[in-house]
């Protein structure tokens, strides 16, 4: 991608024009180019560029795109420090003012660089920070498949990979993109190994709390397989997660009674937890029983007789359970329920179902063939 230049002249003259422009705006900068070469000129120009960020947007974008175009023609070994310096300026400029302009400038730099250049990591992290500060994360690429490819292309160290994913997660959370944020956090936790899983305690803890707090999240068994989460076994947060994975409402109530302060410290609301555990308990009941009496529901879900119908309607809205109410016989008839966990037993059931379909299709095929022969 080509980046617009400040003016169509040689690099040396362009640097001199930039120096003169910045000096005219009050920068303490010589108009004469440095004897050290273009990279030294750019270092001094970037250091002084704050003054032009106060000007009209068109002037600023033109000037800064000129800086970007000069950066892009430097040798890679001279680019990194200068790009880091420019990114720091754009991220920290005047406590978040003019975010759309800063996003545009960073985007021009990011897309103007060679796709495999490792320093694109710095620019992308800066893009995330600025986008998060103004709630504009939707305007930068955050698709997980693309991020994975960049991590590979840029040959990031484990530490930088974790930093990027953590930064992206926090930005998505701040911008209320909870589904995307959850996927990024699972990606982050899944990137740890047995050797370094203990370093991810904070991330694992945060992932669990975020998942339990999400009003649209109901399946949590995949979290138990993540190494950093396994490292939390024996702690209250892991016990709580296990309850939400497979236990019933009564288990949660008992846990809450014994650990009320802990639940409160997580920022989780007890009533929201109760509502979610009622649904999860009902899902488990619906998997095992195709008909559930109102009395059983009242007992297991700890609700009154007048609340059963409203509860079922809300449960169906989540699409976790499909059922209908039989008012006459005071029962719920289940047509389908999502399994809370998907282990060996569920895989076997799926295999048996698919195998039965295959056999039935073969029978139909053979019947059709026999008809065509007659």
Curated annotation (Swiss-Prot):
Coiled coil: none annotated. SUPFAM superfamilies: ARM repeat, Winged helix' DNA-binding domain. The modification N6-acetyllysine is found at residue 254. It is found in: Cytoplasm. It comes from the Eukaryota. GO terms for molecular function: translation initiation factor activity; translation initiation factor binding. GO terms for cellular component: eukaryotic 43S preinitiation complex; eukaryotic 48S preinitiation complex; eukaryotic translation initiation factor 3 complex, eIF3m. Belongs to the eIF-3 subunit M family. Component of the eukaryotic translation initiation factor 3 (eIF-3) complex, which is composed of 13 subunits: EIF3A, EIF3B, EIF3C, EIF3D, EIF3E, EIF3F, EIF3G, EIF3H, EIF3I, EIF3J, EIF3K, EIF3L and EIF3M. The eIF-3 complex appears to include 3 stable modules: module A is composed of EIF3A, EIF3B, EIF3G and EIF3I; module B is composed of EIF3F, EIF3H, and EIF3M; and module C is composed of EIF3C, EIF3D, EIF3E, EIF3K and EIF3L. EIF3C of module C binds EIF3B of module A and EIF3H of module B, thereby linking the three modules. EIF3J is a labile subunit that binds to the eIF-3 complex via EIF3B. This is Eukaryotic translation initiation factor 3 subunit M. It comes from Mus musculus.
């Amino acid at each position: 991608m080509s980046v617009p230049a400040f003016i169509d002249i040689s690099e040396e003259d362009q640097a001199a024009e930039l120096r003169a422009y910045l000096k005219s705006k009050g920068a303490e900068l010589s108009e004469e180019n440095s004897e050290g070469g273009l990279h030294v000129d750019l270092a001094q120009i970037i250091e002084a560029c704050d003054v032009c960020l106060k000007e009209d947007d068109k002037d600023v974008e033109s000037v800064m795109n000129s800086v970007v175009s000069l950066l892009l023609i430097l040798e890679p070994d001279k680019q990194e420090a200068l790009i880091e310096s420019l990114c720091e300026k754009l991220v920290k400029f005047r406590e978040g003012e003019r975010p759309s302009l800063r996003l545009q400038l960073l985007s021009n730099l990011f897309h103007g660089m060679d796709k495999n250049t490792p320093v694109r990591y710095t620019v992308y992290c800066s893009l995330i920070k600025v986008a998060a500060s103004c709630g504009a994360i939707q305007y930068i690429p955050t698709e997980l498949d693309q991020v994975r490819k960049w991590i590979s292309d840029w040959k990031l160290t484990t530490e930088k990979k974790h930093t990027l994913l953590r930064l992206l997660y926090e930005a998505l959370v701040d911008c209320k993109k909870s589904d995307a944020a959850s996927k990024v956090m699972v990606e982050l936790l899944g990137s740890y190994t047995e050797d370094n899983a203990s370093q991810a305690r904070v991330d694992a803890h945060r992932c669990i709390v975020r998942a339990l707090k999400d009003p649209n999240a109901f399946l949590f068994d995949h979290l138990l397989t993540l190494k950093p989460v396994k490292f939390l076994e024996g702690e209250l947060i892991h016990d709580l997660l296990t309850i939400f994975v497979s236990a019933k409402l009564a288990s949660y109530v008992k846990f809450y009674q014994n650990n009320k302060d802990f639940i409160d410290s997580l920022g989780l609301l007890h009533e929201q937890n109760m509502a979610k555990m009622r649904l999860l308990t009902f899902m488990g009941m619906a998997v095992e029983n195709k008909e559930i009496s109102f009395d059983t529901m009242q007992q297991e879900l700890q609700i009154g007789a007048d609340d059963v119908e409203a509860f079922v309607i809300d449960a169906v809205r989540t699409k976790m359970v499909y059922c209908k109410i039989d008012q006459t016989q005071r029962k719920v008839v289940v047509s389908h329920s999502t399994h809370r966990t998907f282990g060996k037993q569920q895989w076997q059931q799926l295999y048996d179902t698919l195998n039965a379909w295959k056999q039935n299709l073969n029978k139909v095929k053979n019947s059709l063939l026999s008809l065509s022969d007659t």
